[in-house]
Structure formats: C-alpha cells, structure tokens
Amino acid sequence: MYNDKSVNENHHIASSFCMLRRPECNFLCDLMSTEPSSYRQFRELAIDLVLATDMAVNGQIVKAFKSSQDAAADETTKNKQGSLMLQMGIKCADLGHLTLEWDTHSQWVQLLEEEFFAQGDWEMQLGLQPSFLMDRSKPGPSKTQIGFFNFVVFPLFGSLHAAVPAVAPMMDALNDNFTRYKQYEIVQKLGGLVWKALNKEKQDIRMSVTTKMIIAV
C-alpha cells in the first residue's frame, strides 16, 4: 500500500479527503466551487503537513527548512518557506510532550512505550518482526531518549528556534527534561558499578573463606 512509503500518514490524509466528499462533511464545498485554485492550494498544503509527521523524513525536512531560511525571498520561495515553516510547526507539535514539565512528559513517554509494545506484540502474533523500539524484550522509547534528543529533537526544535526566537521557552523545557535523562543515566551507571563492586567483594570474601578452609584442612 502506498508503495510502502509513509503508509500511515498517506492513509490518514487519503481517508480525510474521502470524508470531505460526503456532503455532510464537506465544509470546503464553497471554496471548491468558487475558488478552485485556493482549494488546490489547501489540499496541497494539507497533504504536505500530514506527510511531514512521518519521522522517516525528519532529517530531510529540517535540512530543507534550514536552506529555505537562507534563500532569496521571491514569491515562489515565500510559498515554500511558508509551507516548510508549517511543517516544522506540526512536527514540533507532534512531539509537544517533550516540552512539558517532567512529570507530565514522563507519563506521555510511558504511554507511548506501551503503545509501541502493544503494536510489537500484534506484529509478532502475525508472524512479523517487531518494528524498531516495539519489541518488549529490548529497550523501548523510555530507555532511548538521550539518543532521540540528540539526533532528532534538538536539531528539529533548534532549527525552528533559530528562525523563531519565541520558541525559547520550549528549548528551556527540552533542556530540563534532557538533563533529567542524563542524570538518570548517571545514576543507572553508578548503580551498575556499585552492584559490580558488591558482587566482586562477595566473590573475594567467598574466595578468602574457601582458601582458609583449604589451609585448615
């Protein structure tokens, strides 16, 4: 379906326009009849925005957005810049929980992880390989946030912030949550080191006791 490209997003936008064909749902009927060019522009923009939410094209969109900010401001470029600005906006909104305070954000991550794992369970029942981050036997989204922030979140929000300074409060929230994850990672590593040290100490004690028993015999 859809040549295996952005299947979920293509399905959503195609279904939406199918619904718009119903008279009781077509709130754009006047626009379609009186301003067909405006309707075509709306349709094109709606498709671009929905397809932009596919994480597979994240890097491509961020790169195009950065390039558009340096381009000459002719009419064609302005339209493209406007579309890319909206695409960046909807992508950031799609990840909006990352900019919430920690308690709320962490709840979102847990819910997201369970949704991912539920899909992975269903894929396994169908005899399929679980999709990335959807296998319960492997680390899920909650354990991979530092990499996600570094490779996806900061480039995305940072690029928008460079063009729209008003995004600063979101960047502050992102940095706060990222710091939490880093602190958690440090605690986990320290905990692992302490556990290894305790196990080594126990092994040394057992070796010492065993050696003394052998000598006594």
Language-model regions, residue ranges each:
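Divalent metal-dependent phosphate-bond-processing catalytic cores, especially two-metal-ion Mg2+/Mn2+ enzymes
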Residues: 1-217
